[in-house]
Amino acid sequence: MQLSPSEISGLIKQRIEKFDNSVELKSEGTIVSVADGIVTIYGLNDVVAGEMIKLPGDVYGLALNLNTDSVGAVVLGDYEHIKEGDKAYCTGRILEVPVGEALLGRVVDALGNPIDGKGEVATDLTSPIEKIAPGVIWRKSVDQALQTGIKSIDSMVPIGRGQRELIIGDRQIGKTAIAVDTIINQKGTGVKCIYVAIGQKASTIANIVRQLEEHGAMEHTIIVAATASDSAALQYIAPYAGCSMGEYFRDRGQDALIVYDDLTKQAWAYRQISLLLRRPPGREAYPGDVFYLHSRLLERAARVNEEYVEKFTNGEVKGKTGSLTALPIIETQAGDISAFVPTNVISITDGQIFLETDLFNSGLRPAINPGNSVSRVGGAAQTKIIKKLGGGIRLALAQYRELEAFSQFASDLDEATRAQLNRGQRVTELLKQKQFSTLSVALMALSLYAADNGYLDNLEVSEVIPFESALHALAETKYSDVIAEINETGKYDADIADKLKIIVEDCKANQAW
């Protein structure tokens, strides 16, 4: 087919009219050094703090140091193929991770990539890892209980939805066990859980996944793993990634719980990155902004009001509040809670659960020290029946600890003192609880009622746990209607007190233990 000259000129005119002459500007830099996961780039003039930088080999870096003529970035992945003279490009994006319901039941790395061998995560939703925490005007006071199922916590150091409660203690003392039990206890409550493992062995994380699967808790849990073999950069960003996944549920009027295990290792990773970036070291060689590292993370855990949820969802969800409860874990060295990072996190959080090595070694597990443990806002959220019955437990323990030290020097004690010591020993024994044996509100109330009203006083210390087991078994079989009523309402009145009395006296009469 031949075209006439007029047709050719017409075609050329059409092409010229359709020609798009827009220019795409790309900020390009040159890598001048690469070492220990840190790259220094010259020429990236348009980069912003926290921006993702495209590096060779489909790897990204995170811009942390913005100098006059260079940029210091930390590599998010393998950097062995990167060499001096390679090109780096601005992306104009900040780091985002996948979020949504599809992540439940999955194990992902700090960037949200699945590492459990179950295929891709079926979600298109993403969220930036760094977000500004909700302002004061959008927050609601904590007034709903988050039951851990652990007697000593729910009765003495209660946790509310939207609270930040620190778990602090030495290594190998049961910190993770408390967090895992709390996650297991959320089964059937609608609370979504995120467990962030920072700097742990891969075998330890695999063991936690197995425990959660065995107890049917993986269905409502996301695990974010930055293992000990991962780079310091991934260990540093893992808590922020997990927090964004939890905020997805909070902002849509749901309740979520996040465990950071543990923030000491995140602080170590951040210290390593900061020193490699040649930032000036301060106390214990930590950088000057290590407080901000944890405060900007933990302030994102909050209870938000109905207006916030409605505004965020563009009116799709109305009349619902959302919450993100945080359980950060801090590992101390030889019980030193006055070190830099522990004091920082204690001052940021709404209370702490302090675990002691001596208590753990003496067989009291969970090894919670009620003297140093406190919940600053949880009391308002505590279930009414546990609040009423748990007050006597704390008092009995406080009196017991005071008298115990005194009684070592006194040869003969009066009857009242002996009775207080007697009750304190039995209450201490009652608060022992095995891992994976969380209790419902009703069964916990039953145990506390028995201790509060002196039903344990004439038992041998060794009989307390068998008596409690028999009491719970009797209540669940013979008095299941009472148990269901207490679990549903959580109220405490004269009628409930009478019903509890009947159950305890029935058990005492049977002597089934």
Curated annotation (Swiss-Prot):
| CDD domains recorded | ATP-synt_F1_alpha_C (cd18113), ATP-synt_F1_alpha_N (cd18116), F1-ATPase_alpha_CD (cd01132)
The UniProt entry, under InterPro entries, shows: ATP_synth_asu-like_sf, ATP_synth_asu_C, ATP_synth_asu_C_sf, ATP_synth_F1_a_nt-bd_dom, ATP_synth_F1_asu, ATPase_a/bsu_AS, ATPase_F1/V1/A1_a/bsu_N, ATPase_F1/V1/A1_a/bsu_N_sf
Q: Subunit structure, briefly? A: F-type ATPases have 2 components, CF(1) - the catalytic core - and CF(0) - the membrane proton channel. CF(1) has five subunits: alpha(3), beta(3), gamma(1), delta(1), epsilon(1). CF(0) has three main subunits: a(1), b(2) and c(9-12). The alpha and beta chains form an alternating ring which encloses part of the gamma chain. CF(1) is attached to CF(0) by a central stalk formed by the gamma and epsilon chains, while a peripheral stalk is formed by the delta and b chains.
What NCBIfam families does the database record attribute to this sequence? atpA, PRK13343.1
Q: How does it sit in the membrane?
A: Peripheral membrane protein
Gene assigned in the entry: atpA
Q: Give the taxonomic lineage as stored in the record.
A: Bacteria, Pseudomonadati, Pseudomonadota, Gammaproteobacteria, Thiotrichales
Q: Which GO terms describe its cellular component?
A: plasma membrane; proton-transporting ATP synthase complex
Where is this gene product found? Cell inner membrane
Positions of the record's site feature: Required for activity: 373
Q: Name one GO molecular function term.
A: ATP binding
Major location category of this protein: membrane
Pfam families the record matches: ATP-synt_ab, ATP-synt_ab_C, ATP-synt_ab_N
Give the binding site residues for ATP: 169-176
The family annotation for this protein states: Belongs to the ATPase alpha/beta chains family.
Q: Which EC number applies?
A: 7.1.2.2
Keywords, in A-Z order: ATP synthesis, ATP-binding, Cell inner membrane, Cell membrane, CF(1), Hydrogen ion transport, Ion transport, Membrane, Nucleotide-binding, Translocase, Transport
Name of the protein described by the UniProt record: ATP synthase subunit alpha
Q: Which reaction does it catalyse?
A: ATP + H2O + 4 H(+)(in) = ADP + phosphate + 5 H(+)(out)
**What is its biological role?**
Produces ATP from ADP in the presence of a proton gradient across the membrane. The alpha chain is a regulatory subunit.
**What is the species of this protein?**
Francisella tularensis subsp. mediasiatica (strain FSC147)
Listed SUPFAM superfamilies: C-terminal domain of alpha and beta subunits of F1 ATP synthase, N-terminal domain of alpha and beta subunits of F1 ATP synthase, P-loop containing nucleoside triphosphate hydrolases
Disulfide feature: none
